[in-house]
Amino acid sequence: MLKNVSLDDKYKLENKFILVNGTQALVRATLIQKFRDEKENLKTAGFVTGYRGSPVGNVDLQFSKVKKLISEKDIKFHPGLNEDIAATSLWGSQQAEMRGESNYDGVFGFWYGKGPGVDRSGDVFRHSNLAGTSKNGGVIAAMGDDHSGESSTVLFQSEYAFKDAMIPILSPSGVQELIDYSILGWALSRYAGVWVGLKCLKDTIDATEVVDGSPDKLKIIYPENPVKRGELSIRVGDTPHAQEERLHRQKLPAVKKFALENKIDREGFKKTKLSKIGIISSGKSWLDVEHALELLNIDSETAKEIGLTSYKIGLVWPIEPNGLKNWAKGLKTIIIIEEKRKLMEEQIKNILFGTENQPQIFGERDLQGNLLFKNEGVLEPVDISIKIAQILDKQINLKSLQNRIILLKELLSPKSNAVVDDRTPYFCSGCPHNSSTKVPEGSRAYAGIGCHYMALWMDRNTEGYTHMGGEGANWIGEAPFSTREHIIQNMGDGTYNHSGIMSIRASVAANVNITYKILYNDAVAMTGGQQHDGDIGALEILQELKAIGVKKVIGVFDEKEQLNLDKFKQVADMRPRDKIIETQEELRKVKGVTAIVYIQTCAAEKRRRRKKNLFPTPNKRVFINPEVCEGCGDCGSKSNCVSILPKETILGRKRQINQSACNLDFSCVNGFCPSFVTVSDAKIKKLETTSFQFPKLINPKIPTIDKTFNIVITGVGGTGVVTIGAILAMASHLEGKGAGVMEMTGLAQKGGAVHIHCKISKKPEDLNAIRVAIGDADSLIGGELMVSASNKTLSLLKRDKTKAVCNSVEANSGEFTRDRNFSLPQEGMLLSLKAKIGPDTVSYTHLTLPTSDLV
């Protein structure tokens, strides 16, 4: 019997077991907190603010979708202009009732921001944490970290920034603990009068799981304190010296006391009288450790037999000492496993130093000083399992360990034989960046944060970048010592609104020769197409640039945009977009700071709006006549568009336009070619649904699930790869199984490689890490071959274990826009996939044709 499930279940508090992703879990947590306060007869409100950025790039989208629901619960969502302004707003929320001027008993706050946003907000974090939180309010700060650097310019670990501001840090393992730790975090924040950090990694925030969302799941204990509850809260007339003393002498001890009473740290494998070896971990690494022990065939019974126990630390700073000491008592060896810099290891060594029978500790290094668990990159469960096995093998008698070490090392050996590099992200069809990032011959441009960062790997003479908001300020330091007289700086309207205008003002003050090329695409494209905070428009940007002293400002626009040109021309010279090169040539001759505002709506956002009839659809289509086309590739060179595909004929390679993917930009017609045909009043013919007959499908043999069934789904961004993972997870949930999915997010993935990791288990509690480990995939669903046969994918597969079904469609990459002869080595890629898992385990067929007939 399938469950009766609706899409609204995730936010209905009466539903216990729900399927949610990490971001949705955070939304539910705010609703749960409001519910719990009402049960305590507290009239509270919620305030959510921050700034988007992977892996917390969709927090604002999820809260915006349920704005009506949260408003009814007095939860206000207000996206910040940038991270530190948002954090300052939350500081203000804790002062709401401080002076007797509020209608509420308190405001519980939630801040979100990516690692770079944590860095730029250090000043306000320190000030607001010292000031404290309100008795019935509290603040959680969700730090979005990207340990693997999959969608960031640096590999971030934010705990040390929070530690430096003396903000306690909770590190959840999985989606369930995102909810649980949020509730615990607000309670801790109220009790101790501190902000509380919440570690949000891709493996938790971008994961989807079945969780227990009961609002009454947790029973919070408020320990007795030497001071009355509320006396550690924010107050009027406080002094810096009193704040510092209170933080060290009262608040941080209260944090540890709360953690002990509420058992935030807990045992995994239970400690017994026989236990001599202990493993400590936290957060995402805890899930990796659980999986690593599975790979060693060590379950709770085996652990008991060999004297192994484990300890999960939830509060990673400051670590609660009493629970740790009690657990560690009698242990001879402790292995500390944590990803990146070793935040816990130093604390644990300090806590256990000088204790009776002090254990030997393995952490970043072994007892001889050799590197054990690295600081850079990420830790893989297979590597963790090998390191654990090698330590255990010297201390216990377990015959199977040596064999497991040999087998696991084979998985790590570099045997992948991919014939091509992985697919890289590319500008969408019709993306304004295809035209706006072009620079004149002899000029050089800088990139920055945004989709235009991808120009770095295209033929755009673009080199170098800065952090968000620093765009162009590096030229202030480079220009006096450079032989180059002028530079071009690309900048998105989102960055301009966030903080970029300050760099432009600095450049004006320094009077350097630079042209800022600001794309106004009417959306924060990289993170999901959100509206700009404050709804700043292109006209306002032009006016602002003139007001701050930019020498010359020119507007360049796509003529399909509906602009009131009379208004714009009162502010700046306005030119069609085909004048972009000569406009840059003109401005590089001007001494001082100049600017171009390039006005063209984001292609992906146009597509979304057109589906909702919110954006006009041109009444024409462009086709290529293959009889005339000579395959010169000038159309691709002019447009940089990935919707121009090769068409192989008996007369050689021609070109065709993928009408399904085309976003109606029409810049391809600028190619010097007579083969283009423009058809007015044209609509793509759709197949009548009645004309398609579904074949009779044979019921498949369902594999037996032993622990988990691990699926890797690959394909090209924008083709429904994420949707497949979501469907599989929901189907498993409907059958009462456990399901977990981890999605690729961040930098615009249209045209780039997408990997979805999906795990299915008999019961939700059987799931640990959702990321599929090296050589641990049971099944591969390949949307196309280039990603499916990449080294990244092949490393997850294993002969005699993995079975694959792969689409044979030839999905060319962005390289084809620059190289007219580029083609994918389909046969070679297929051979490499078959060589990895065996020729009889790969089903390879063209799946795009029958599916495209249905849409």
Functional labels for PLM-detected ranges:
Residues M1-V175, L201-T204, T272-K273, I280, ...:
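Thiamine diphosphate
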Residues N58-S64, S89-G92, R120-V124, G149-Q157, ...:
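Short acidic, glycine/serine/threonine-rich loops at helix termini
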Residues V118, I536-L539, K552, T678-I713, ...:
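Active-site cofactor/cluster-binding pocket
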Residues D145-W195, L201, P226-T239, E485, ...:
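Conserved thiamine diphosphate
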